[in-house]
Design a protein with these regions (language model features):
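Bacterial N-terminal signal peptides
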Residues: 31-41
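Thiol/selenol-based redox catalytic cores and closely related redox-interacting motifs
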Residues: 110-173
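Acidic, Ala/Val/Gly-enriched low-complexity intrinsically disordered segments
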Residues: 4-5
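Bacterial N-terminal signal peptides that target proteins for export
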Residues: 10, 17-33
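Short, low-complexity, Pro/Ser/Thr/Gly-rich segments in the mature regions of secreted, periplasmic
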Residues: 175-184
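Sec/Tat signal peptide C-region and signal peptidase I cleavage site
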Residues: 44-48
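N-terminal secretory signal peptides
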Residues: 50-108
């Protein structure tokens, strides 16, 4: 890659700095654009963190099935909207039903309004980012609403679970479809 030294002092020499400050830029406009994009990406402030998951109260109900979710802490799932409102679920299956038919369950919201999605990791029982989770279906483990997507933060844990509990399919968040969810009912 050919580069060219470009002085940033308009070619004037500063007595204390010799020839002034210079840096190397690529000559090609495309390479220059890529260099600038990479630099801006690396040094831009990070986006705002997702809000922390909220604990359900004894009165919080799943908007899909109507169950009181606090009774099932090992299966909790949650959607948090940008305006601070939220919904709790008694498992990953119901959160997907909700997301696939948001107009039915929460007509005032759109997918773009969602700030965070949480599911509960099956092994360590902690809330994890649902969009980054691995889900196992077809296992011998059932959730509060029967057959369930079993969430994991780590792919290795999901694969180990599949071996131990006869799991059939491992999916990422974006691979879950309405047809798969209907097949679990």
């Amino acid at each position: 890659m050919k580069t060219e030294a470009i002085p940033i002092n308009n070619g004037r020499n500063f007595p204390s700095r010799g020839k002034g400050l210079t840096f190397m830029l690529p000559r090609s406009p495309l390479k220059l654009l890529l260099t600038l994009t990479l630099t801006l990406t690396l040094f831009s402030p990070a986006r705002a963190e997702d809000p922390k998951p909220l604990k359900p109260t004894p009165k919080d109900k799943c908007p899909v099935c109507g169950m009181f979710v606090a009774k099932y802490p090992d299966w909790l799932a949650q959607v948090i909207f940008k305006d601070g409102s939220h919904a709790h679920f008694d498992g990953a299956k119901d959160i997907f039903k909700y997301l696939f038919n948001l107009k039915k369950y929460n007509p005032s919201k759109k997918a773009e309004d969602i700030q965070a999605i949480y599911v509960t990791d099956y092994y360590d029982l902690s809330p994890i980012n649902g969009r980054e989770a691995f889900f196992v279906i077809g296992s011998d483990i059932y959730g509060p609403m029967g057959r369930e997507l079993i969430p994991f933060q780590k792919e290795a844990d999901a694969r180990g679970f599949m071996k131990d509990h006869k799991g059939k399919i491992l999916l990422k968040f974006k691979e879950v479809t309405p047809e798969i969810i209907r097949g679990l009912d």
